[in-house]
Regions:
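A structural signal for multi-pass alpha-helical bundles of membrane permease subunits
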Residues: 1-197
């Protein structure tokens, strides 16, 4: 198994995919949760709409992304004027699938981080402000340590979820172009149902 070039490629592609998905979805979820933790008018509407990706099936989201990334009628190429075939280009295909997966996972991460932020006592921020700590210092010295149990849990759940990503790859790229998006789970599927191994 380890001598197979296809398997080694699939393993490398999967590891890159997992890193992009986990980092992207956790950062997006954390930023949204920190922003929604402030008392800003209309924040409830934003938080509700941000959590909506959880309710979208990965197959539906993949089809929406396929339309957005279409080289001729896709909105991304219309807005940027780049004319790139995002899904058919090996340089961009894995990133496109990873961005879709990170976006889908960011909604649940947002809820986890929001719950964690609600458990951090506001008085420690007030004391830190009185002591002269800036917002950035408060974030790194108070918020992140306060969220560390939630962050560990979210990290583990996101890693497991990223390794299980199948629908997006099947609908967007089918492991291609070449084997640029051939994740391990898709490789297993292809070997089991098409190569009969």
């Amino acid at each position: 198994l380890l001598t197979s070039a296809s398997f080694r490629n699939s393993l490398m592609v999967t590891l890159i995919f997992v890193v992009i998905v986990v980092a992207g979805s956790m950062i997006l979820g954390l930023i949204a949760a920190v922003l929604c933790n402030k008392a800003i008018p209309g924040i409830r509407f934003f938080s509700t709409s941000y959590a909506l990706p959880m309710a979208i099936a990965s197959s539906s989201a993949a089809m929406i992304f396929k339309i957005i990334l279409n080289p001729t009628i896709g909105i991304l190429n219309k807005v940027t004027g780049l004319g790139i075939n995002w899904i058919a280009d090996p340089k961009y295909a894995l990133v496109c699938v990873a961005v879709l997966t990170a976006w889908l996972n960011s909604g649940i991460n947002f809820l986890y981080f929001s719950a964690g932020l609600a458990n951090i006592d506001d008085s420690i921020y007030e004391r830190a402000s009185v002591d002269g700590a800036s917002g950035v210092q408060q974030f790194f010295s108070l918020t992140l340590p306060g969220l560390s149990p939630i962050m560990f849990y979210t990290l583990v759940v996101n890693i497991i979820g990223a390794f299980q990503s199948f629908g997006q790859v099947k609908l967007l790229t089918q492991g291609g172009p070449g084997e640029s998006t051939n994740l391990i789970v898709y490789s297993i599927y292809r070997d089991a149902f098409f190569n009969y191994r």
